Curated annotation (Swiss-Prot):
Listed GO CC annotations: plant-type vacuole; plasma membrane; plastid; side of membrane
S-S bridge residues: C79-C113
Residues of the Phytocyanin domain: 23-125
InterPro entries: BlueCu_1_BS, Cupredoxin, Phytocyanin-like, Phytocyanin_dom
Low complexity composition-biased segments: 135-173
The protein's name: Blue copper protein
Amino acid sequence: MAGVFKTVTFLVLVFAAVVVFAEDYDVGDDTEWTRPMDPEFYTTWATGKTFRVGDELEFDFAAGRHDVAVVSEAAFENCEKEKPISHMTVPPVKIMLNTTGPQYFICTVGDHCRFGQKLSITVVAAGATGGATPGAGATPAPGSTPSTGGTTPPTAGGTTTPSGSSGTTTPAGNAASSLGGATFLVAFVSAVVALF
C-alpha cells in the first residue's frame, strides 16, 4: 500500500510541475492577432521565447476580420489557405501546445498571411532545460519535417483546447519567472527524494 501512495504522490507532483511551468502567450502581445505593419512582426515577437509542451497560445482578434488556421509548413510558406489542419473563426482562440516540433499558424482572410499575419514556432518538451531558442519564430529551413499534430481540433466557440493551459503571458527568460521555477524545482526534487 505504501508503494501505491508513493506512486500516486509522485504522479501528482509531476503533474503539478508541468502546470506550474506552463506559460500562456498572448500572440502579438498588445498588437494582438492582426495584419501587422511590419511583415516580420510575428517572427520578431516569437524570437527569444521558448515554447514548451503545455504552454498555451491565445490569439485575440476582431471577429469577422481575422481568423486562425493551423497549417502545414508548405501551406505556411506559400500562404495556402484551402486545406488547413484546423480553422477557428471565433475569438479568442486558445491553442494548447501538446507536441514538440514546428507549429504553423496563419490568417486566411484576404492577403493577411502574405502581409505577415502568420506565426511559426518550435515547441520543445515541457521539461527541456536551457534558455529561449534564438529565432524560435523564424521560418524553418526548407525540407524540414512539419508537425501537424501539435494542437487539438477546435471546440465550439473557436477555441482549440490542446492539453495543458493557462491565460497570461510571461516572457520567456523573465528573471522573476526563472527564479520561481528554480525554487519550485528544488522543492519538487526534495519531495521526490524524501518519498523514495
